[in-house]
Amino acid sequence: LDDWLSNEDTKNLISRERPRNSYSYFYCFNFDPQFDAEYEPDNWRKAVNNENFRKALSSALNKTKEVAVLEPNVPEDYVIQTITPAKFTYNADGTDFTEIGDMAALGDTFNEAKAVEYRDLAKSELAAEGVTFPVKVLLPYNPTEVNWDKECQVVEQQMESLLGTDFIDIIVQTGPTDGFLTEIRRNGKYAMLKCNWGADYADPETWTDPFYQAKGENGYD
């Protein structure tokens, strides 16, 4: 480490944390809500366990429009469609990992027609289970992160406009300035939340850690 720090060619490569471009961002659904009763956690629990409900929300999210809050010029360059981001690893032929096999066919998950189709299926299924509408979707953000509040506003307006305010009620909530990760995500005080993950090593598998767990593990923390 001392050699790197003393070398003009390498000293700027040392950082106390990962560079910001070494993170992926994605939304998580909370299947074990611990938020206040006013946001109807039991109702949310029933709704989020319905596959068509989850597909409706996923298909209704226009990621490009959200990313445009942060990068208005070329937002599509920052939208990822795979768990492993593009331009991270390549095979021996120089082909991007995300363009190999079935991943090459993956496209934008935003699909208005599919979102409405899933919504209608979810409505009838959830109504039979006693779910009340609109389903409250608690969406907190960290006020110390620049423009995260604006991202949430765009998500709220865009998704409610497509799915209808009679189906979902996205509630944007300001989280704490200190200890956001522990207070909100780790304590389950959200319905839907923008989360992130960083690469630990130079292999595509490093990005999959939040999405599976071994027996006895508590999952993404």
Language-model features, listed with the residues they occupy:
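Extracellular/periplasmic solute-recognition and catalytic clefts
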Residues: 1-36, 68-70
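Short helices/loops that flank or line small-molecule/ion binding pockets
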Residues: 1-8, 52, 153-161, 178-191
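Secondary-structure transition/capping motifs at alpha-helix termini
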Residues: 7-14, 126-129, 160-167
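Structural recognition of the beta-strand scaffold that forms the well-ordered cores
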Residues: 16, 25-30, 56-60, 67-68, ...
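Periplasmic solute-binding protein
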Residues: 18-45, 58, 85-97
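Acidic-aromatic pocket-rim loops
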Residues: 19-23, 28-36, 174, 178-221
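Extracytoplasmic/peripheral linker and loop segments enriched in polar/acidic and small residues
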Residues: 46-55, 59, 63, 67-70, ...
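Append "and occasionally in soluble cytosolic enzymes with long acidic Gly/Pro-rich linkers
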Residues: 47-161
